[in-house]
């Protein structure tokens, strides 16, 4: 049964998925969505429904709906029908149709009374009103919609149509869906209208409050026409905003220069006679006039200049006779016809360009010339072009197919019928393709194994290594193309030689002579439609020697097995690539070819060389022609402050027009207007609404403000809450609540009535709709399921997990109990409860309610309260309803269709508890003080009372003793006497009282008749008398008491007073006992808090103890590891480089030299000279890792050299052996690590040392051979030709000394095994270069810098980053390639980094790729940075200077030290082409500072002759034109006194953007100072005025730049000046990527050597050897050998063949059999073992495995990603080839 149920359920799910994914459902969904795209068509539809009444109104309604539906049907049909789609889906339909039609309706209908729009006769057809309504709704439905744009929906349709098979079904279903949505919408509109008409509550309760609003609804109904006209006007305005009207905008001038006037503006499209060859649109021939628009859009190849030049060839004499005698027109006859038709299209063309050109002049999206981009239009082209191509042997749609290739292939197919291929079955094609690839792979494998066998048989290196193929320019002269232009060397990234035509007049005779020797390729002939039958008679094969390809040093023959091509392919190949040589005697051919003319076409382009009004004011226009500013800037005026009338001589040499112009340098300021700037740098004529995004904050932000970088922003409290203000508001609200309570009661009564009415209305509306109850019921059921089983359990899990994280006990049981208690009861539509599972009958149609009993509310905690407390709560608050009804939105209501009630907040009890805790803390903190205060007051009162009682008793006893002593002279002893004394005292008191009363009575009897005043006086006198008597008596009693106190006992004397004291104490104690309860509670609470805090702190204390214990264990382990590492370092004596110079300890200082790269190059140079090589010895050397980075073991190398007889390490002979430079280069190129680009070579110290040694040894060594002297002559000749000064910093004597030192140092490096070493070499080098640099340029701290290992970056002054500007160029006379290295101020630090740093190793590898990143770093202060990664380098270097070497980190803006020394030289008469092309700034004074430059020579062959004279003329023309253009541009520019000024100006204007930040007060101060400066500059004696302005306070001295050496660094530290560089894209070639990738994965051990001053921790990781070392870690592996220095067998093949071999292996991975694939590759590996070691197996030898894997892995990884993905498949993600790498390499076991 269970299986059956699951089967049914699975079928239902699959059925539902099929229904959802079906075409009909998707079409319905799309159609339903289109109903929401409400456009202007709905205005007419709604007007017909609202306004028209009667019989004619119903007809109008019907016509409006039919027209509306018909228009929508046309839109849906246009999806399927392409012509209709092109007509309706273009944006110009809005411009042509919508706006005039809308405006016509608005102005036509606005003057009429819309409500009285009816006609007199019913069926009158002359009015055509019903037809107009139909047309309105039909036409307006075709317009683009604006509430929900239809473009989004159209894209959805196109996406689905692309993968949909049954397209017509999709269109019909979408139309049906739209129809359903439209019906629902119109029903809803009808219900709204009926509700407005029938609802009396609007007039009675809501709107009509007085007689004023009595007729509001009627007026609203009557003014519907006006409302619709207003809506129509708003629509017109909206479309006007979207459609830029070209009538009211200013038209800019377009550039219409022809391309033939300038040489550099020609595009290599001579072969293309039709514009359709290079355009993607493939227009018809009669649309050639519109091609200019397509070219402007950048879809073809556009060069860097602003004109576009198309060269086509055609024949004026188009009539030529065929063999049949018929006449035919040529293929370019249409030009003549088009010229005739142009006169009729004088109106059509501007109208078309006005309407349809979306990139017209009033669009602000044109490109503007700046310092980086100087093109009219960027070469932007879509990377997606769909075309069929073969992939994996099958025809597939490629989305990155070259469009030019596809058009060319289509043309060839049309012209040549043999190109049309028969379609083969896909299986046959794939098998054929796989067989070809398998054959290629086998051939490569054989060649690879043959080369390995040759290596094993110890052949010479020339026979083993495959050399690169170079393109030969001239075979007899053995001239090759330069490396940058050679397609075999550079592939896709190669350059393109532009052979520019000479300026010479070609006469008819010259043309006829030249035609005799001309030849035409057959491909050109096919495209030109020339008569082939005549040409085929004169076919001769191409002389292949003229285009021969020489393979240099290829010692292996081609594979014997060649592919057998079919006859058709051979014929096609011959037909295409044979050459037709014209015969001079054939007059027809001469006629055809002599009449070729060049057609130059003017292409209109909008000007892109625009300048702003601000630039025009500042005078920064580079051209002589005055230009109108094309960009609107803020309103400003140029105020000239100072004019320098001293003339500056401008000297230009070797030019046609030498002129000395005097210019007056003006110093001007720009004064802006105070009004706000609304121009925002907008282009003149463009629309303001369509401008680019404008900056609303600062133009250049010092810090990031985007939410994307929120984690990098300093965490600050952006919002501050006013707590006291909130408290005041709360208190004021509480006070006002009582007053508002009565008002609230009345409002509640009214609200309840309104709520009831609203519930009834909602219930009725749900009943009125057709499918409303179905939708509502399904939504309710889904909401109940979501609430019960998804949302609430998730909330429970989150809550309890948070409690566990906060170290609190979870409440799973309580929450689950409450959750299970919640019940969802299904009810009828009226609210009758049924059960949890039972649904009411017909609930989908009749409706349903869901009642929730005991709704679950998430609580932060559960309190265990007693039953009494619960009953108390119920009595106080009343019984709360434990049920609610569920709404469609998942909310809760008390009644069905009621308003949603608020749920009890989860965070409210938390906030209450927090408030309670805070209040308790406050009360407890002050409770102790209160108690102490109360106790203190009680104690003081008690003491006072005791004191008063004692005094009273004492006085009383004393008086009584006196009385007793008077009456009884007997000694008073015993209690009896005291008792008698007390009785006598009482009697006396009573007698006194009676006497007093009697006296008063007598007096009152006697003086009844007397006056009041006399009585008062008498009473006062009597009282005084009585008081006196009493005082006397008391004094007597005191005396008696003192006399008789000795007779009384002490115990009996204080019995009665002690009783009274006890009573007072008893009273006070009861009070204390009553208040002591609070004190006890306080103590108990404090104890409980302390215990609770202790329990909470237990896990924290335990974790802290755990971390501390682990930390101590780790510290001990690290300390032991460090000790072990130091011991191992002490034990090690292995030296990997043959030329590593030992650190020599002298008495004064320790100097160590590192010329590892020099000696390595020298050893390879020696090895390349071996004429009779014995590779049995070389094999032993290969085992010890020579071929990659040459870490030699000294003893074995020494023995090998002794046996070969190359040199002896004891014999100090300076004679060098003979060699060719090319062999040396080829040896280096065979190792791909040395085959780097020129920029990478220039950055390496290796290349520079090699160059210095070559140059200096050639000049000074007397024992050179003839060949070396020839090289010397070549170098000297080059110096004479280009007037190049090799080293202008040093004099000839210094050069002589330097050369001898280099020579000696080179010699010493070979004999580095000697124990003694001449320290004078190091001192001489140090003095020669370090001191030269430091003293020449006046750098402070010379003595400290010389002998430092780590140079402090704050000492030196460098303005630019360490980037070398290298411009490769070709010397046409010798065909040599030079690199002009422009050395700026910042580059001279190289001399310090080479020699001055003693222990710093100049290694081959880039230090983990950090060189490139630090060279490309920003020019800014690090306090204001965009990305904190750059800040890391600076901060780590400041703390630990050993992290980054000195040459890698030079900060940019440090203390400015002016260069005072200048070297003067005379201007030469001839400016070399090198200086013309590279130097940007000329120094026009007699004194100028030279910048040192370096030249790098690369000679390809020995005997190279001068090239042709045409190339020389071209080179001269280029030089002259370049010099003219540069000097013309510099005429209006500011001239500089030194190169430092020029560089600084270039830096500030071209390469950076700066920004000043200060407050308004500081700004005002500066402005006041500037105003004073403007006056002072003009005066001859400004002292008096300056002093007076200072006294008046106009000029403030605190902001003056008083310091002489005031630098930008201080301003940047303070944050006033912010300088950021312009972000430029850096283009890296593939070889540099290889170099950087290997540099990341392989880290040299010498990188981690440190000085004794800074000790570094070394960690050994034996388990993870393969891990790449990150940039910020230094990790050394303790091994006996360097595992990455070994011979890679794969380097036997050339890089091209190597890639081909790998790719063929990758293509073979389609078979899902990884075992076979690995076994094949393992076989290759086993064959390779013979190279590395014959005796040992590769699998067993762990070291060789690690070596093999560590080198092959980065090679494969890099080339797979960079070459295959990026350039071939146009993907940058490497996931596609991850499985290839997994299958390619097995995991080697590590023991």
From Swiss-Prot:
Pfam families: Ycf1. It comes from the Eukaryota. Coiled coil: none annotated. Its main location: plastid. This is Protein TIC 214. It is found in: Plastid, Chloroplast inner membrane. Involved in protein precursor import into chloroplasts. May be part of an intermediate translocation complex acting as a protein-conducting channel at the inner envelope. Belongs to the TIC214 family. The keyword Transmembrane applies. One of its GO terms (biological process) is protein transport. Keywords: Chloroplast, Membrane, Plastid, Plastid inner membrane, Protein transport, Transmembrane, Transmembrane helix, Transport. Part of the Tic complex. Residues 1498-1511 have a biased composition (Basic and acidic residues). There is a partial copy of the N-terminus (positions 1-343) of ycf1 in the inverted repeat (BAF50158). InterPro entries: TIC214 (IPR008896). The chain crosses the membrane at residues 19-39, 68-88, 91-111, 133-153, 176-196, 227-247. One of its GO terms (cellular component) is chloroplast inner membrane. Residues 1492-1511 are annotated as: Disordered. It is a multi-pass membrane protein.
């Amino acid at each position: 049964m269970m299986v059956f149920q699951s089967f049914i359920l699975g079928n239902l799910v699959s059925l539902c998925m099929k229904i959802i994914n079906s075409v009909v459902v998707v079409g319905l969904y799309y159609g339903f969505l289109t109903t929401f795209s409400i456009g202007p068509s709905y205005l007419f539809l709604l007007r017909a429904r609202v306004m028209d009444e009667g019989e004619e109104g119903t007809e109008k309604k019907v016509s409006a709906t039919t027209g509306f539906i018909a228009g929508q049907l046309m839109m849906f049909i246009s999806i399927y029908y392409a012509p209709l789609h092109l007509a309706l889906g273009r944006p110009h339909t809005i411009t042509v149709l919508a706006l005039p039609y809308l405006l016509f309706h608005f102005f036509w209908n606005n003057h009429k009374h819309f409500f009285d729009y009816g006609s007199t006769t019913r069926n009158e057809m002359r009015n055509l009103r019903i037809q107009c309504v139909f047309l309105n709704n039909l036409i307006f439905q075709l317009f683009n919609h604006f509430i929900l744009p239809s473009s989004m929906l159209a894209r959805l349709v196109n996406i689905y149509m692309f993968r949909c098979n049954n397209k017509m079904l999709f269109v019909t279903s979408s139309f049906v869906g739209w129809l359903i949505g439209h019906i629902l919408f119109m029903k809803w509109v009808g219900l709204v209208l009926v509700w407005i008409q029938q609802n009396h509550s609007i007039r009675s309760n809501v709107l009509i409050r007085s007689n004023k609003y009595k007729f509001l609804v009627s007026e609203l109904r009557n003014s519907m026409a006006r409302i619709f006209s207003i809506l129509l006007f708003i629509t017109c305005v909206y479309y006007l905003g979207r459609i830029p009207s070209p009538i009211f905008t200013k038209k800019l001038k377009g550039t219409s220069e022809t391309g033939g006037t300038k040489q550099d503006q020609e595009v290599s499209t001579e072969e293309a006679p039709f514009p359709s060859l290079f355009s993607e649109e493939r227009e018809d021939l009669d649309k050639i006039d519109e091609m200019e628009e397509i070219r402007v859009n950048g879809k073809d190849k556009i060069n860097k200049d602003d004109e576009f030049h198309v060269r086509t060839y055609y024949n004026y004499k188009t009539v030529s006779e065929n063999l049949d005698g018929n006449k035919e027109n040529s293929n370019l006859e249409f030009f003549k016809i088009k010229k005739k038709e142009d006169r009729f299209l004088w109106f059509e063309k501007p109208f078309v360009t006005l309407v349809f050109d979306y990139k017209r002049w009033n669009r602000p999206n044109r490109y503007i010339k700046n310092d980086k981009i100087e093109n009219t239009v960027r070469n932007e082209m879509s990377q997606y072009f769909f075309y069929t191509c073969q992939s994996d042997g099958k025809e597939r749609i490629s989305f990155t197919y070259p469009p030019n290739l596809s058009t060319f292939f289509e043309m060839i197919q049309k012209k040549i019928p043999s190109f049309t291929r028969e379609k083969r079955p896909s299986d046959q094609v794939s098998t054929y393709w796989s067989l070809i690839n398998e054959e290629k792979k086998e051939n490569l494998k054989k060649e690879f194994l043959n080369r390995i066998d040759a290596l094993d048989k110890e052949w010479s290196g020339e026979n083993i290594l495959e050399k690169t193929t170079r393109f030969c320019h001239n075979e007899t002269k053995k001239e090759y193309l330069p490396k940058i232009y050679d397609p075999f060397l550079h592939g896709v990234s190669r350059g393109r030689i532009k052979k520019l035509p000479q300026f010479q007049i070609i006469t008819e005779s010259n043309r006829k002579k030249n035609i005799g020797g001309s030849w035409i390729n057959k491909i050109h002939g096919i495209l030109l439609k020339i008569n082939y039958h005549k040409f085929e008679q004169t076919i001769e094969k191409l002389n292949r020697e003229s285009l021969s390809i020489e393979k240099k040093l290829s010692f292996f023959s081609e594979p014997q097995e060649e592919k057998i091509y079919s006859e058709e392919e051979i014929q096609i190949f011959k037909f295409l690539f044979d050459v037709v040589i014209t015969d001079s005697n054939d007059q027809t051919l001469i006629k055809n070819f002599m009449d070729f003319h060049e057609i130059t076409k003017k292409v209109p382009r909008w000007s892109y060389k625009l300048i702003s009004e601000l630039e025009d004011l500042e005078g920064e226009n580079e051209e002589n022609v005055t230009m109108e500013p094309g960009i609107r800037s803020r309103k400003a005026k140029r105020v000239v402050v100072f004019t320098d009338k001293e003339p500056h001589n401008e000297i230009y040499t070797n030019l046609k027009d030498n002129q000395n112009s005097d210019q007056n340098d003006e110093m001007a300021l720009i004064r802006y207007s105070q009004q706000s700037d609304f121009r925002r740098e907008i282009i003149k004529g463009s629309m303001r609404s369509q401008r680019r995004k404008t900056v609303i904050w600062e133009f250049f932000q010092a810090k990031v403000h985007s939410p994307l970088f929120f984690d990098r922003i300093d965490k600050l409290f952006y919002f501050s809450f006013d707590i006291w203000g909130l408290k005041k508001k709360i208190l004021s609200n509480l006070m006002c609540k009582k007053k508002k309570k009565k008002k609230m009661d009345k409002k509640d009564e009214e609200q309840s009535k309104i709520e009831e009415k609203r519930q009834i209305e909602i219930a009725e509306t749900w009943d009125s709709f057709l499918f409303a109850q179905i939708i509502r019921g399904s939504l309710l059921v889904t909401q109940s399921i979501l609430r019960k089983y998804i949302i609430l359990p998730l909330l429970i899990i989150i809550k309890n997990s948070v409690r566990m994280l906060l170290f609190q006990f979870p409440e799973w049981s309580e929450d689950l109990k409450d959750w299970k208690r919640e019940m969802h009861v299904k009810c009828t539509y009226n609210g009758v409860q049924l059960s949890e599972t039972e649904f009411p009958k017909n609930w989908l149609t009749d409706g349903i309610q869901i009642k929730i009993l005991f709704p679950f509310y998430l609580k932060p905690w559960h309190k265990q309260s007693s039953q009494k407390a619960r009953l108390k709560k119920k009595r106080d608050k009343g019984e709360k309803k434990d049920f609610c009804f569920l709404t469609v939105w998942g909310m809760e209501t008390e009644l069905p269709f009621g308003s949603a009630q608020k749920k009890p907040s989860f965070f409210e009890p938390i906030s209450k508890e927090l408030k309670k805790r805070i209040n308790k803390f406050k009360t407890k903190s002050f409770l102790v003080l209160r108690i102490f205060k109360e106790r203190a007051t009680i104690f003081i009162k008690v003491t006072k009372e005791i004191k008063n009682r004692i005094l009273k008793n004492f006085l009383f006893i004393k008086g009584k003793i006196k009385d007793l002593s008077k009456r009884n002279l007997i000694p008073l002893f015993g209690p009896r006497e005291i008792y008698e004394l007390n009785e006598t005292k009482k009697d006396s008191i009573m007698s006194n009282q009676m006497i007093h009363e009697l006296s008063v009575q007598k007096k009152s009897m006697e003086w009844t008749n007397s006056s009041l005043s006399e009585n008062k006086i008498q009473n006062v006198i009597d009282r005084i008398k009585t008081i006196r008597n009493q005082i006397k008596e008391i004094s007597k009693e005191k005396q008696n008491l003192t006399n008789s106190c000795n007779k009384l006992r002490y115990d009996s004397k204080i019995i009665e007073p002690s009783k009274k004291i006890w009573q007072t104490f008893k009273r006070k104690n009861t009070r204390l006992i009553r208040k002591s309860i609070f004190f006890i509670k306080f103590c108990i609470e404090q104890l409980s808090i302390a215990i609770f805090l202790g329990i909470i702190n237990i896990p924290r204390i335990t974790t802290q103890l755990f971390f501390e214990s682990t930390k101590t264990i780790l510290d001990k382990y690290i300390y032991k590891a460090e000790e072990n590492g130091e011991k191992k370092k002490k034990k090690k004596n292995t030296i990997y480089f043959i030329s590593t110079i030992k650190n020599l300890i002298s008495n004064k200082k320790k100097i160590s030299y590192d010329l590892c790269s020099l000696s390595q190059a020298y050893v390879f140079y020696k090895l390349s000279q071996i004429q009779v090589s014995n590779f049995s010895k070389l094999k032993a050397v290969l085992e010890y890792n020579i071929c990659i980075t040459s870490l030699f073991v000294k003893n074995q190398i020494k023995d090998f050299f002794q046996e070969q007889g190359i040199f002896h390490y004891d014999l100090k002979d300076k004679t060098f052996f003979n060699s060719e430079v090319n062999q040396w280069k080829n040896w280096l190129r065979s190792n791909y690590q040395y085959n780097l680009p020129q920029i990478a070579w220039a950055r390496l110290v290796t290349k520079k040392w090699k160059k210095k040694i070559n140059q200096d040894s050639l000049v000074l060594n007397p024992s050179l051979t003839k060949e070396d002297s020839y090289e010397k002559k070549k170098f000297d000749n080059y110096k004479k030709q280009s007037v190049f000064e090799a080293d202008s910093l040093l004099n000839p004597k210094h050069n002589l000394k330097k050369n001898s030192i280099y020579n000696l140092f080179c010699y010493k490096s070979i004999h580095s095994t000697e124990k003694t070493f001449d320290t004078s070499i190091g001192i001489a080098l140090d003095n020669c270069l370090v001191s030269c640099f430091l003293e020449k340029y006046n750098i402070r701290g010379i003595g400290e810098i010389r002998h430092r290992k780590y140079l402090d970056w704050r000492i030196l002054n460098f303005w630019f980053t360490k980037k070398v500007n290298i411009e490769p160029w070709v010397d046409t006379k010798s065909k040599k390639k030079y690199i002009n290295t422009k050395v700026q101020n910042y580059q001279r630090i190289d001399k310090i980094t080479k020699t001055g740093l003693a222990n710093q190793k100049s290694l081959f590898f880039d230090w983990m790729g950090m060189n490139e990143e630090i060279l490309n770093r920003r020019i800014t202060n690090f306090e204001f940075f965009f990305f904190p990664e750059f800040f890391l380098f600076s901060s780590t270097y400041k703390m630990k200077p050993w992290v980054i070497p000195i040459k890698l980190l030079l900060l940019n803006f440090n203390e400015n030290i002016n260069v005072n020394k200048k070297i003067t030289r005379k201007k030469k008469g001839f400016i070399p082409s090198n200086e013309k092309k590279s130097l940007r700034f000329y120094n026009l004074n007699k004194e100028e500072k030279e910048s040192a430059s370096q030249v790098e020579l690369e000679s390809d062959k020995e005997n190279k002759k001068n090239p042709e004279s045409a190339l020389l003329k071209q080179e001269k023309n280029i030089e002259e034109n370049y010099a003219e253009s540069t000097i013309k541009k510099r005429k209006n520019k500011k001239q500089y006194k030194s190169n430092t000024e020029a560089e600084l100006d270039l830096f500030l204007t071209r390469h950076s953007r700066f920004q000043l930040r200060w407050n308004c007060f500081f700004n005002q101060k500066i402005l006041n100072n500037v105003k004073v400066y403007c006056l002072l500059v003009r005066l001859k004696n400004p002292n008096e005025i300056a002093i007076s302005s200072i006294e008046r306070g106009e000029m403030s001295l605190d902001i003056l730049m008083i310091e002489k050496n005031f630098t930008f660094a201080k301003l940047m530290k303070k944050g006033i000046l912010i300088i950021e560089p312009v972000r430029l894209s850096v283009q890296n070639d593939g070889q540099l990527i290889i170099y950087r990738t290997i540099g990341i994965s392989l880290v040299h051990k010498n990188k981690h050597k440190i000085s004794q001053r800074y000790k570094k921790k070394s960690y050994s990781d034996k388990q993870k050897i393969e891990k790449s070392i990150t940039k910020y870690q230094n990790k050394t592996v303790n091994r006996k050998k360097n595992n990455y220095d070994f011979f890679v067998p794969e380097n036997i093949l050339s890089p091209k063949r190597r890639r081909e071999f790998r790719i063929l292996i990758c293509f073979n991975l389609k078979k899902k059999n990884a075992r076979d694939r690995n076994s094949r590759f393992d076989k290759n590996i086993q064959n390779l073992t013979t190279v590395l070691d014959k005796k040992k197996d590769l699998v067993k030898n762990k070291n060789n495995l690690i070596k093999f894997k560590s080198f092959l892995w980065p090679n494969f990884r890099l080339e797979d990603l960079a070459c295959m993905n990026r350039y071939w498949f146009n993907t940058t993600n490497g996931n596609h080839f991850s499985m290839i790498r997994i299958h390619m390499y097995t995991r080697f076991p590590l023991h």
